[in-house]
Amino acid sequence: MDDADAINAALLALRVATGLMFFAHGWVHLRRVREGPGVANWFGSLGMRQPTLNAWMVTLVELGAGPMLVFGLLTPLAAAAVIGVAVVAWITNHRKAGFFVYNRPTEGWEYVMLLTFVGLALGALGPGEWSLDHAFDVADDLSGSTGLAIAAAAGIGGGLLQLLVFWRPPREA
C-alpha cells in the first residue's frame, strides 16, 4: 500500500465510521418519532419551538447525511450536516454537563465536539479518491479551503440559524 492508498483508506474509514454512526442516530430517531411524541417532547423540553418539526428535521438530516458521508457524495455538505447537528446539540443540551459524555443527567460535550472537528476535517481533506465525489470529478473542487469553508459556514451557520429560528432556552427554576 503506497501513501496515497493509505490516505484514501484512512479517509474512507473516517467517512464510513462517521456516516454509519450518524445514520444509526437517524434510524433510532425515525423509529422513535414514528412511535409517538417522545422525541418531539424531548426537543420541546430543550426549548425548541415546533418540536415535532425539529425532530423530523434532525432525523432526515441524519438519515440523508450519513449515507452521503459513507459514499463520499457532496462531502462538504454532508460534513456541514454533521457540524450543524452537533452545534445545535451542544448549545441546547450538552454544554452545561461538562466535558465527558458519561456525565449525567445529560451527556457532556466531548462527542459533539469530536463530530464537529471530524466534519471540519472531512470538509478540508475531502473524501479521498475512493468516493463518489472523486468518481464525479468534483472532489478537487470541493476540498481544501473551499471544502472547509462550505462545511464550516453551512454547518455552523445552519446550526445557529436553526437555533435563532426555533430555540427559546427554558427558564431555569
What are these regions (language model features)?
Residues 41-44, 65, 85:
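N-terminal, well-ordered alpha-helical segments
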Residues 60-69:
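Hydrophobic, membrane-inserted alpha-helices
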Residues 34-49:
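Cytosolic, membrane-interface loops and tails of multi-pass inner-membrane proteins
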Residues 1-31, 38, 52, 56, ...:
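Extended, low-polarity transmembrane helix blocks
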